């Protein structure tokens, strides 16, 4: 969970969300992480961020376009590494099957 513009947000990844992300990035998630050493391209980072973003305690996902804009602002204000770490930590938490035996 993290705070941005005085609101609480969280990421929620699932197999269904990953399928959507992989359609957009045209790259399997594990291949993307391995290929980049976990340092996703800005385009891919914005995609993972936006497709998994929810306001805290909400049942619905945040609008994707607004999520991409938020990601861009956070990268500019807090730094790429901070944002990438938030996304990867949530991915590890929600989809541990990607990281078994690694």
Predicted features and spans:
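Residue-level signal for threonine
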Residues: 14
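Charged interaction scaffolds used for protein-protein
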Residues: 1-5, 19, 23-43, 59-102
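Amphipathic alpha-helical interaction segments
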Residues: 52, 56-60
